From Swiss-Prot:
<keyword id="KW-0210">Decarboxylase</keyword>
<protein>
    <recommendedName>
        <fullName>Aspartate 1-decarboxylase</fullName>
        <ecNumber>4.1.1.11</ecNumber>
    </recommendedName>
</protein>
<feature type="binding site">
    <location>
        <position position="57"/>
    </location>
    <ligand>
        <name>substrate</name>
    </ligand>
</feature>
<keyword id="KW-0963">Cytoplasm</keyword>
<comment type="similarity">
    <text>Belongs to the PanD family.</text>
</comment>
<dbReference type="GO" id="GO:0005829">
    <property type="term" value="C:cytosol"/>
</dbReference>
<comment type="subunit">
    <text>Heterooctamer of four alpha and four beta subunits.</text>
</comment>
<comment type="pathway">
    <text>Cofactor biosynthesis; (R)-pantothenate biosynthesis; beta-alanine from L-aspartate: step 1/1.</text>
</comment>
<feature type="active site" description="Schiff-base intermediate with substrate; via pyruvic acid">
    <location>
        <position position="25"/>
    </location>
</feature>
<keyword id="KW-0456">Lyase</keyword>
<feature type="active site" description="Proton donor">
    <location>
        <position position="58"/>
    </location>
</feature>
<dbReference type="InterPro" id="IPR003190">
    <property type="entry name" value="Asp_decarbox"/>
</dbReference>
<keyword id="KW-0670">Pyruvate</keyword>
<keyword id="KW-0566">Pantothenate biosynthesis</keyword>
<dbReference type="GO" id="GO:0006523">
    <property type="term" value="P:alanine biosynthetic process"/>
</dbReference>
<dbReference type="InterPro" id="IPR009010">
    <property type="entry name" value="Asp_de-COase-like_dom_sf"/>
</dbReference>
<comment type="function">
    <text>Catalyzes the pyruvoyl-dependent decarboxylation of aspartate to produce beta-alanine.</text>
</comment>
Length: 114
């Protein structure tokens, strides 16, 4: 048996912009993607703490401290909203991996690792 478990989380990120006229996705700082072990193109769940929206999209590499929602997802958040970006991994039943959890400050810098 396999289970979907938390693999990575960017907690309390701030939306830096929205671009509705784009194919889709979320642009995330390349260094944050690397630190969180989230691949470019990986499916992620985004939880908007500010308004309660939840949705799935995929990642693209962004600029330093960027956290920008693109395409249809851009309608689900506004600049300044607090979000959580979550990725999951498929693990065998007895596997209990330690997830990578990064808490971010108001400027999308890592403030703490859990």
């Amino acid at each position: 048996m396999r289970r979907w478990l938390l693999k990575s989380k960017l907690h309390r990120a701030r939306v830096t912009g929205t671009e509705k006229d784009y194919e889709g996705s979320i642009s995330i700082d390349a260094a944050l993607l690397s630190e969180a072990d989230i691949a470019v193109g990986e499916q992620v769940q985004v939880v908007n703490v500010t308004n309660g929206e939840r949705f799935e999209t995929y990642t693209i590499e962004g600029e330093s401290r960027q956290m920008e929602l693109n395409g249809a997802a851009a309608r689900l958040a506004e600049t300044g909203d607090v979000i959580i970006v979550i990725s999951y991994g498929l693990y065998v039943k007895d596997e209990q991996p330690e997830p990578t959890v990064l808490l971010l400050d108001e400027e999308n810098r890592i403030s703490e690792r859990e």
